[in-house]
UniProtKB/Swiss-Prot annotation:
UniProt EC number: 3.1.26.4
Assigned protein family: Belongs to the RNase HII family.
PANTHER family referenced in this protein's UniProt entry, alphabetically: RIBONUCLEASE, RIBONUCLEASE H2 SUBUNIT A
Protein name (database record): Ribonuclease HII
InterPro entries named among the record's database cross-references: RNase_H2_suA (IPR004649), RNase_HII/HIII (IPR001352), RNase_HII/HIII_dom (IPR024567), RNase_HII_arc (IPR020787), RNase_HII_hlx-loop-hlx_cap_dom (IPR023160), RNaseH-like_sf (IPR012337), RNaseH_sf (IPR036397)
UniProt-recorded Gene Ontology molecular function terms: manganese ion binding; RNA binding; RNA-DNA hybrid ribonuclease activity
Protein biosynthesis recorded as keyword: no
Gene source species: Hyperthermus butylicus (strain DSM 5456 / JCM 9403 / PLM1-5)
Binding-site positions, a divalent metal cation: D13, E14, D112
Main location: cytoplasm
Cellular location(s): Cytoplasm
Keywords of this entry: Cytoplasm, Endonuclease, Hydrolase, Manganese, Metal-binding, Nuclease
Stored CDD domains: RNase_HII_archaea_like
Textual note on the cofactor: Manganese or magnesium. Binds 1 divalent metal ion per monomer in the absence of substrate. May bind a second metal ion after substrate binding.
Amino acid sequence: MQRRRCRYAIGIDEAGRGPVIGPMVVVGVAVCSNDIDKLVALGVRDSKQLTPVVRAKLYGEILRVALHSVIVKLPPALLDAVNLNQLEVETFEYIASRIAGVHDSPEAVYVDAVGSPEKLAARLSGRLGVRVIAEPGADKTYPIVSAASIVAKVVRDAEIRMLRRLYGVRGSGYPTDPETIAWLAEEYRRNPANPPWFVRRTWSTLKRIAPGWYVEKQATTQPPRGQRSLLDYLLGEKQS
C-alpha cells in the first residue's frame, strides 16, 4: 500500500493518569491539516463531555480520518517504578518520533500539558526539532488533541471492562470512586499478601485501605547508559 503524504499535525493526550487501578493510556493521533475540519464535523471535542456510547462511535471515525495513530499502554508496575512526569514526557516523545519515522516531520505537535507547559514545550521541541504547543486543557481547545483524548479514553475504558470481567473489579479505578475503594478494601481483607498486578502500589490511597500492598516509590528518572530514553529502556529497545 502506498504511503499517504500530506502536511500534518500530531495531537497527544492520555487517559488514566490518576487511577489506582489499571494502565495509563497515552495516544498520539496524526491528521492531515486539510482533514482537521472533518474532526470538527464529526463532533470531536473533550472526551469528558461525551458519553461512553458517543466516544465509542467517534473512536472508529477518528481512526478512519487519521493519517497515523500510536497507542501506548503503561502498566501499573511501570507507573510505580518511574517518575510519572518524566515517563509522560518520554512517552510523548516516543509517540511523536514513531509517527515522524513513518511520515515526514509534522508541522506541529499539540499536547495536553501537565505541570509547566513552557518547559514541556521547550523540551519536546528541542528533542523532536518541530514546533510544540503544550497547554493545560488542550483537549478542550484543539480538535486533534480531543481526538487523541477520545481514543485514549475508549482504550482505557476497555481495559477496565476486561479487569471487571476477569477479576471482578468494581468501579472506575479512580481513588475518588467509593465503589473502587470498597472493592480494594474487600480484596485486601481476602488476600493481604498478594496485591493484584493491576493495582498501582505506590498510590497513597493504599496506605489507608491496603497498607500491606503499599510500597514507597523509588522512581527511576534517568535511562541507563547506551539507551536513547527512559521509555526505550523500559520497552527493551536498545540504541542501534
